């Protein structure tokens, strides 16, 4: 799992990367591509740490990639370093302009790069298929011949493939093309101090299914440099419950369809990241493949039930909230699990 950060020069994308990952991307030996991990804020996890007081604490992480390149080489650098990204966060400058139409224009400029790249891929593939059609098409070619014209029509309209409403099966069948605009995207509008309404105005003008969040990177960078107690005071003065970058990290986490379950004990409290709708054996594989191979049962209690019954396993079990689940159980976000296995 990896999320690429997109944005025009001076949009604030590298600043956002630095805030979320605590890395100075522009100072890493002049490298074009910098990778870092952001901790996913989770009150449930913090509560479990307080209860178990473990020797080791392992919160959920989201990997981000920032590419520092400008000019003619910028898009080539993006292609090279973000081709494996599962989704994108596009940061848009909303602080240096007064009109939301200008923000839309800058957002669309980056979207157009993705769309044009995908259009070239589709056209090249259709051209090759036309040349080889006389020799006969494979079943895979036949399936592609049916869907590629639909993709081309969407791209010709200047619309990203993610807005086409493709099924999960169709998206999976197109993975070999590595389309850019088919991947999920979160838009972050970097606003001026005191002008959060710019992000709201932007959201009104883009596709309804486009997730949009606003942030003032200038304020958030100042906040990130403070201690935990100083942050609380700073936020209280502003009447804000949490830093905006925390919401962005969580939104990026859910954007990729990920959830977290917990394992808890005196040695370690850990948040395990898995795809949503994972069955128990696959969730166990996140710990070790042997857990999946020798899976017997999963002892499960939801975080909500655990907290409701005094944050104690014994009380939750006495109340009938501790369950033994089999191979078909679909793990839910926030489950606290102990796996039983035998290899």
Name each model feature, range by range:
Residues 48, 89, 122, 190, ...:
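Residue-level signal for inorganic ion chemistry
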Residues 2-17, 21, 33, 128-332, ...:
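C-terminal-of-GTPase-core extension/linker across diverse P-loop GTPases
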Residues 18, 28, 100-104, 199-201:
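Short amphipathic alpha-helical segments
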Residues 41-45, 61, 75, 82-86, ...:
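Amphipathic alpha-helical transducer elements in NTP-driven molecular machines
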Residues 1-97:
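Conserved G1/Walker A P-loop phosphate-binding module
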Residues 39-41, 67-72, 85-121, 127-141, ...:
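Conserved Switch II/interswitch segment of TRAFAC-class P-loop GTPases
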Residues 22, 50, 112, 116, ...:
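Short, intrinsically disordered, mixed-charge
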């Amino acid at each position: 799992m990896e999320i690429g950060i997109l944005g025009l020069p001076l949009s604030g994308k590298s600043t956002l990367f630095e805030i979320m990952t605590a890395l100075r991307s522009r100072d890493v030996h002049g490298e074009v591509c910098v990778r870092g991990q952001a901790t996913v804020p989770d009150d449930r996890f913090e509560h479990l740490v307080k209860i178990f007081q473990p020797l080791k604490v392992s919160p959920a992480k989201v990997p981000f990639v920032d590419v520092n390149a400008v000019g003619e080489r910028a898009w080539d650098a993006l292609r090279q370093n973000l081709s494996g990204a599962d989704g994108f966060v596009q940061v848009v400058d909303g602080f240096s302009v007064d009109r939301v139409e200008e923000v839309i224009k800058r957002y669309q400029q980056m979207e157009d790069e993705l769309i044009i790249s995908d259009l070239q891929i589709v056209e090249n593939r259709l051209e090759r298929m036309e040349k080889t059609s006389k020799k006969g098409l494979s079943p895979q070619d036949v399936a592609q011949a049916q869907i590629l014209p639909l993709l081309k029509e969407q791209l010709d309209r200047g619309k990203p493939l993610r807005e086409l409403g493709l099924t999960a099966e169709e998206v999976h069948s197109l993975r070999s093309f590595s389309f850019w605009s088919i991947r999920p995207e979160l838009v972050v509008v970097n606003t001026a101090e005191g002008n959060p309404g710019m992000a709201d105005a932007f959201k009104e003008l883009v596709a309804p299914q486009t997730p949009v969040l606003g942030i003032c990177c200038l304020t958030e960078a100042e906040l990130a440099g403070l201690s935990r107690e100083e942050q609380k005071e700073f936020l209280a003065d502003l009447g804000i419950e949490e830093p905006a970058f925390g919401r962005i990290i969580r939104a990026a986490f859910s954007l990729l369809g990920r959830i977290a379950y917990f394992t808890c004990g005196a040695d370690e409290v850990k948040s395990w990241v898995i795809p949503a709708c994972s069955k128990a054996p696959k969730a166990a594989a996140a710990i070790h493949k042997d857990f999946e191979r020798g899976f017997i049962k999963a002892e499960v209690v939801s975080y909500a039930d655990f907290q409701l019954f005094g944050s104690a396993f014994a009380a939750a079990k006495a109340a009938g909230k501790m369950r033994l689940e089999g191979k078909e159980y679909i793990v839910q976000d926030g489950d606290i699990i102990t796996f039983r296995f035998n290899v």
